[in-house]
Amino acid sequence: MAKASIFVLLASTLFCCQAAPVDRHAVSDVHCPLNVKILDALRGAPAGNVALTVFRQGADKTWEKVASGNTNIAGEVHELLSDQDFKPGVYRVEFDTKTYWKAEGRTSFHEVAEVVFEAHAEGHHHYTLALLLSPFSYTTTAVVGKEHE
């Protein structure tokens, strides 16, 4: 049990170091209010080609699909939504983890991983969602930054 806890701690530390932005005002992020970064905890490497879908909750509490994409070789997705399209509200990002693990030759427990969050509750912000992924668990965190000036 102690070895597993140490592994999770080390993997989380590595993931946070990899997910930290080097240049907070990078050209690709200027008009990109929602970024995603995924790390495959088994390989200790970015999880490329993970499909994801972004939904926004309507006034009637139903979910409307507003964007979709796949992670690149670096395990990242940029330009999912423009600043103009990323309106205040509740969002759900659904990651197709089952398909990813099947392509890796592994069986997984979860069909999808989900992150539900409220955007712009305290003014306009930029969000980076980070996902640490293994076949039987996932951990998420978010880096929330102010609007680029």
Predicted regions and their residues:
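Extracellular Ig-like/FN3 beta-sandwich strand-entry sites
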Residues: 31, 86-90, 124
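A short, solvent-exposed beta-strand micro-motif common in secreted/extracellular proteins
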Residues: 88-99
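Beta-strand signatures of extracellular beta-sandwich domains
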Residues: 51-55, 92-94
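Short acidic/polar inter-strand loop motif in beta-rich domains
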Residues: 98-109, 138
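Surface-exposed loop/edge segments in extracytoplasmic proteins
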Residues: 60-68
